[in-house]
Amino acid sequence: MIRVLVIDDSLFIRTVVQDMLSDDPDIQIVGVASDGLEALDKIRELKPDLITLDIEMPRLDGLSMLERKKEIDRFPKTLVLSSLTSEGAEMTKRAIALGADDFMLKPRGIKNIREIGGELKHKIKNICTIAYITAKPVLKDSNARNVVLIGSSAGGPPMLDTIVSKLPSDLNAAVIITQHMPKGGFTAALAARLNRISPLQIRETENGDVLKNGTVLVSRAGFHTIISSVLDKGGSQSGKIILTDSPPVHNVKPAVDKTFISAAQVFGNHCVTAILSGMGNDGGEGTEAIKKAGGVTIVCREEDCLVYGMARSALSRNCVDHVLSLQAIPEKIVETIRAMNG
């Protein structure tokens, strides 16, 4: 049983979070607090396993509270609930730097609650079970000949935890994650958090990045991540990141399709794709492009996804090689990359 303390100055958010978690037999709400000072007292008293934490609160805000976490023996795991603003994104990045374990966007209203309830439960359980990587090997600086492409939206972040934590540090490929998120810094915070739990080096994309083996790039929100061809000193082809501010595709930016289609043109049959949870049709056309180029295509099975729109779009095009459980996807990725390298 995971014991949770809900911390938020909004009665609406406190009530919503309690309602979303109340039907899960593995989670118990042990209390609520409306500001950081009250929360510190309740952490000492109730000893929760995890707190959901608002940042902007009276008396003592969430960041100041995290700065005081050393005052408490065995400070609980921390899930930040962030507002959908550029300021909220910046404060979320600071919270991750101060030791928060994960974050997610607050529900915008009643219609949004069902969409995020499942993700909230997944995140809480992931946070309490996943291990941090404290030291990473120094990798040989080698341009990637193979690329792994992962696309996800609603419900995707907890699934990304599972995948990146199980990929080996010597993966002979670059990895690009395209996760639908609002711009303003949320994808940087996602990359920083994933970097803690993976043996691979993970960061947000920068314009001009050359794809390297053993590295994971998270597509920067507000731009499409395009892969173009680049030659290394030995004349071998690899890929380079171009961030473009072209119009949204499927009403999102970054779009999975833009990344997948460009990768197919550069890496051809040296691509592996995986579509995870997400609503809408993004990723279907891109998966088809990878399949036509000779790459290997994967979608997660429906029972492991919060929303099955993106995976269903790919399946409807008859271009999917493997429908797998979430737990089986990392193993299949590694197996496929090894086969590509002979």
Curated annotation (Swiss-Prot):
Active site per UniProt: 153, 180, 282
UniProt KW Metal-binding keyword: no
The organism's place on the tree of life at top rank: Archaea
Reaction equation(s) it catalyzes: [protein]-L-glutamate 5-O-methyl ester + H2O = L-glutamyl-[protein] + methanol + H(+); L-glutaminyl-[protein] + H2O = L-glutamyl-[protein] + NH4(+)
GO molecular function: phosphorelay response regulator activity; protein-glutamate methylesterase activity; protein-glutamine glutaminase activity
Residues with PTM 4-aspartylphosphate: 54
Keyword Cytoplasm part of the UniProt annotation: yes
Keywords linked to the UniProt accession: Chemotaxis, Cytoplasm, Hydrolase, Phosphoprotein
EC number: 3.1.1.61, 3.5.1.44
Chain ranges of the Response regulatory domain: 3-121
A GO BP entry: chemotaxis
Gene Ontology terms: cellular component: cytoplasm
InterPro entries cross-referenced by the UniProt entry: CheB-like, CheB_C, CheY-like_superfamily, Sig_transdc_resp-reg_Me-estase, Sig_transdc_resp-reg_receiver
Maturation and modification: Phosphorylated by CheA. Phosphorylation of the N-terminal regulatory domain activates the methylesterase activity.
Pfam families: CheB_methylest (PF01339), Response_reg (PF00072)
Compartment annotation: Cytoplasm
Domain CheB-type methylesterase: 141-340
Major location category of this protein: cytoplasm
Family (UniProt): Belongs to the CheB family.
PANTHER family: PROTEIN-GLUTAMATE METHYLESTERASE/PROTEIN-GLUTAMINE GLUTAMINASE, PROTEIN-GLUTAMATE METHYLESTERASE_PROTEIN-GLUTAMINE GLUTAMINASE
General function of this protein: Involved in chemotaxis. Part of a chemotaxis signal transduction system that modulates chemotaxis in response to various stimuli. Catalyzes the demethylation of specific methylglutamate residues introduced into the chemoreceptors (methyl-accepting chemotaxis proteins or MCP) by CheR. Also mediates the irreversible deamidation of specific glutamine residues to glutamic acid.
Free-text comment about domains: Contains a C-terminal catalytic domain, and an N-terminal region which modulates catalytic activity.
Alphabetized NCBIfam families for the sequence: PRK00742.1
Name the record gives this protein: Protein-glutamate methylesterase/protein-glutamine glutaminase 1
Annotated organism of origin: Methanospirillum hungatei JF-1 (strain ATCC 27890 / DSM 864 / NBRC 100397 / JF-1)
Species lineage: Archaea, Methanobacteriati, Methanobacteriota, Stenosarchaea group, Methanomicrobia
Gene for this chain: cheB1
